[in-house]
């Protein structure tokens, strides 16, 4: 009765391949006139939580169900998704050098939760997995503010690039910036330790600790640490 939280399932990173880039032909003319507005802020699109309850036959689990840990018969799968698009303006100094200023960032966030329980499972097991769901949703409550804070540190940032193909190098740089933003979001979100502590408090659902109390204690103790 353990939630599975390896990073490959806990946090899935999605970076939009087509980052927002203003027209290369316009960069040379407009960059000298345009400066990023001081009040420019990143755009955060936080999607509602997508939740599903799935029941399975232990003798024939569905192909899309993550493997159960040894000794466990149910699990809560939480996927925190993030993708970022980054746009900028370039000021070209010569044929192989330019300065790119980041002027636009949009981050889209999503949380998908699936609780997997076997047919005929007890209510106690279901309640334990619901506790894992509550922990994930607690972290997602402030995910928008976290993403905004991280993205804001990149707004207006100027990056020097050197290449024979400045357009391609600019695209590569903006894509890397998008990756950096989502990587930092994933690192700081980090609900894993709280999920592990919740399992420790409840002995993976084997004891009689009230789920609500266990969730609160796990969140509080991790926050103190």
Identify the role of each PLM range:
Residues 120-124, 133:
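Active-site alpha-helix of zinc metalloproteases
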């Amino acid at each position: 009765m353990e939630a599975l939280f390896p990073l490959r399932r806990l946090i899935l990173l999605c970076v939009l391949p087509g980052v927002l880039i203003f027209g290369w032909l316009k960069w040379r003319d407009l960059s000298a006139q345009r400066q990023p507005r001081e009040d420019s802020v990143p755009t955060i699109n936080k999607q509602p939580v997508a939740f599903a309850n799935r029941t399975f036959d232990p003798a024939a689990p569905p192909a899309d169900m993550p493997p159960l840990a040894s000794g466990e018969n149910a699990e809560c799968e939480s996927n925190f998704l993030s993708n970022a698009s980054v746009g900028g303006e370039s000021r070209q100094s010569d044929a192989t050098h330019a300065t790119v200023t980041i002027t636009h960032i949009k981050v889209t966030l999503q949380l998908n939760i699936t609780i997997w329980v076997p047919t005929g499972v007890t209510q106690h097991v279901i309640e334990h997995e619901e506790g894992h769901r509550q922990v994930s949703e607690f972290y997602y409550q402030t995910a928008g503010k976290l993403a905004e804070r991280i993205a804001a540190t990149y707004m207006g940032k100027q990056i020097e690039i050197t290449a024979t193909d400045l357009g391609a190098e600019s695209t590569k740089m903006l894509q890397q910036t998008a990756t950096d933003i989502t990587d930092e979001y994933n690192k700081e979100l980090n609900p894993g330790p709280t999920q592990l502590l919740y399992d420790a408090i409840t002995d993976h659902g084997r004891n009689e600790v009230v789920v609500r109390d266990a969730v609160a204690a796990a969140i509080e103790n991790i926050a103190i640490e």
